């Protein structure tokens, strides 16, 4: 029986597997940015464990990175974050009254609303300095020439990471981007400029395909049994107008894919 680790229902990794890579024989390379400990709510462990994929896990918080290396010894694990530049960055680690420093909600900068909520829950903040890489420095240092899947969940820093990926010769075929903090519209526009088409949404994540690989995924889709289309992002995450536009773009893409 296959084991999935991702957040939500259906789990993120199961959703990605069934929609984009449903053949267990498909080989690939993934990048998970914001990997945490490599196990808790992990979106890519399934692909390494079950399908034998090569993986790169990026986690900038030192004490969490230590657990990542223990949980995922077969991956390439990096104690860095991605950004629009290479260097260092101030980072707000969250100390939870129950879970302590082991939380998934640290961020370069929390939104005022989220910070107010966390304080109300009894959380405190510990400022640390993390190392960050621009995308091109990351792929050149790791000698990466192909990426099939990237999962990007960095608590509101997504736009900066994407800005650092512009004009790169190596871009992921499939992008899974958490949109709840930065906003769907902003991220959709950046990715469109980078050569991506919006596909579908599931829970807090939006999925994008690189335009040049659309025929490949159309072929894979045609070979699989038809299933229900995933629900769009909930209303509380984006505006009704954005949601209507998102659904329209999804429908247009499905028409193009046949």
Language-model-detected regions and their locations in the chain:
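Phosphate/nucleotide-binding beta-alpha loop and adjacent structural elements of enzyme active sites
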Residues: 1-258
């Amino acid at each position: 029986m296959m084991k999935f680790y991702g957040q939500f229902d259906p789990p993120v990794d199961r959703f990605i597997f069934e929609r984009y890579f449903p053949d267990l024989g498909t080989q690939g390379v993934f990048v998970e940015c914001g990997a945490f400990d490599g196990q808790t709510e992990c979106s890519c462990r399934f692909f390494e464990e079950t399908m034998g994929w090569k993986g790169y896990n990026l986690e900038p918080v030192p004490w969490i990175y230590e657990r990542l290396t223990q949980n995922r010894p077969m991956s390439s694990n990096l104690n860095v974050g991605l950004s629009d530049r290479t260097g260092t960055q101030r980072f707000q680690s969250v100390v939870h009254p129950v879970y302590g420093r082991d939380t998934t909600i640290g961020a370069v900068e929390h939104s005022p609303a989220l910070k107010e909520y966390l304080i109300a829950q009894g959380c405190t903040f510990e400022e640390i300095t993390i190392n960050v890489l621009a995308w091109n420095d990351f792929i050149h240092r790791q000698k990466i020439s192909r990426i099939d899947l990237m999962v990007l969940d960095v608590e509101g820093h997504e736009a900066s990471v994407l800005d650092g990926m512009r004009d790169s010769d190596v871009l992921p075929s499939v992008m899974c981007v958490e949109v709840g903090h930065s906003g769907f519209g902003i991220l959709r526009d950046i990715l469109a400029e980078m050569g991506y088409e919006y596909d579908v949404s599931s829970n807090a994540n939006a999925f994008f395909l690189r335009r040049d690989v659309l025929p490949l995924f159309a072929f894979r889709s045609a070979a699989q049994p038809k299933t229900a289309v995933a629900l769009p992002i909930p209303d509380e995450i984006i505006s009704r107008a954005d949601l209507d536009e998102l659904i329209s773009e999804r429908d247009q893409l499905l028409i193009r894919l046949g």
